[in-house]
């Protein structure tokens, strides 16, 4: 049978970091206030020359090197982003060109913070049906460009960054020791909650980009239940449960949400990858960046059972179970 295997992974961050103390210089907040409520200590902010595309290119190049491949080996690029360089064309096409790729195809997916989960699931489907052999899946966002920097409830939460994975179709014998790759995926969305987390602008309405707006307490109220339900569904689809898990890689939005979700799922905090303290919420880049850090730190190893999950505006949410 065909399995989608993560062949390589990489990440990219802007050059400039912004600490909680830095933010406290221009908005009424403090390091202790932010850390206590979110777990975030710093985030990275793109400069004028750094964009969703440039960060995406950097992450893609790192993933290709990690995979031992070149852009000539890639058939498709899927970019998850909510902050494209232009309304159109798709930023994925710009990344395709910047990488020197003129074959195959590229397109964007928009599912906010769940974007990488949606993109990886789409890539998995393309590989299993034979549309492509290798796909470059990227999550890249520059949320600093859509933040109201006078709103202390949102500007402290987000950072910029990109992460990428090379997904490859491999013939796998199911049930044997070498059986690895994506085992199950589950995606969900419900537009009834769109007013809980959104951007108050757009080309078809205000003709302006707008700013990110969020009802933080409402998001927290729904997040843990939605996340844990979809993770349980993902386990069930693969005939497994949380006791078999080696690593839990959640969306890095808020440390309290991460800890509450892990507790409800019965996953030891020692098995949870947490990078929100270093990066803040990088939206679609969150999960691949956390994966990259976990691999660089020597945590995730070949054969490990890894659960990815994310939740974003919409609401959108999803989970992916992978045998590394």
Curated annotation (Swiss-Prot):
Residues 252-256 are annotated as: ACP-binding. One of its GO terms (biological process) is secondary metabolite biosynthetic process. Keywords: Acyltransferase, Cytoplasm, Fatty acid biosynthesis, Fatty acid metabolism, Lipid biosynthesis, Lipid metabolism, Multifunctional enzyme, Transferase. One of its GO terms (cellular component) is cytoplasm. It catalyses: malonyl-[ACP] + acetyl-CoA + H(+) = 3-oxobutanoyl-[ACP] + CO2 + CoA. InterPro entries: ACP_syn_III_C, ACP_syn_III_N, FabH, Thiolase-like. The keyword Membrane does not apply. It is an enzyme of class 2 (transferase). Pfam families: ACP_syn_III, ACP_syn_III_C. The active site is at 113, 251, 281. The last Arg residue of the ACP-binding site is essential for the weak association between ACP/AcpP and FabH. Belongs to the thiolase-like superfamily. FabH family. This is Beta-ketoacyl-[acyl-carrier-protein] synthase III. It comes from Bartonella henselae (strain ATCC 49882 / DSM 28221 / CCUG 30454 / Houston 1).
